[in-house]
Amino acid sequence: MSPAHVLEPTYRRLKRALMEGTWPIGQKLEAMRLADEFGVSMTPVRDSLNQLVGEGLVDLTPGEGYRVTLLTEHSLRDMLAVNVLLLESVADPAPRKIDTADLAAPIDTYADRVGDVFSIFALGSENRFLRQTGDLISDRLHIVRRLEPDVLPNALEALAELEGSALATPSKRVQALRRYHDQCLANVSRLIAVLAEQGST
């Protein structure tokens, strides 16, 4: 096992690169090459890749090695369906008090802002497993969320509604969640097509 002071930054850097689409979906990830690029030994890279296999961002095939997890229309639809169910389940009960400072945090990108507001919604649940599952789904969807402003017809409006609903009534949160996810589901084919196009360039 790698020392924490080496493993943690290696893991975070690799995870962020995967979430940002640095490598095309399905591309082989060579631990030796990544170790050279990151300036670390193979051990923290392998440990990080194995952790990311558990999180669903990397696939491991015995005898073949690591690859960026493939994302299909079917798997994207499944993740979106589970995501909205999880978030709706914490929208109905009275959530724990949301700190308005969380909503004002400096988040750079559209994809980060979507993930951030969903994390805030999940704070309404005392169920730690539910929150962790939501975070895992959010991390896997990040690569697609980067594309939403260019693919979804009303992406920015949907995001503004989500952010505004964080401090609104449960019914408003559910309404915002459904509108956002309905828009995503209606454009799954296009999102996957654009993702594939990016990987081929």
Q: Where are the language model's segments positioned?
A:
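C-terminal all-alpha effector/ligand-binding and dimerization domain
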Residues: 147-201
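Long, contiguous secondary-structure blocks with strong helical propensity
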Residues: 2-10, 112-119, 138, 142, ...
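A ubiquitous short alpha-helical element
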Residues: 1, 49, 71-75, 104-105, ...
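Short linear motifs at protein or domain termini
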Residues: 1-93, 193-201
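Amphipathic alpha-helix face/heptad-repeat signature
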Residues: 75-82, 110, 133, 151, ...
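Hydrophobic, amphipathic alpha-helical faces that serve as interaction scaffolds
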Residues: 82-93, 116-156, 185-190, 200
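All-alpha effector-binding/dimerization core of bacterial HTH-type transcriptional repressors
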Residues: 69-126, 164-175
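Short, hydrophobic secondary-structure boundary micro-motifs
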Residues: 25-27, 61, 130-134, 173-174
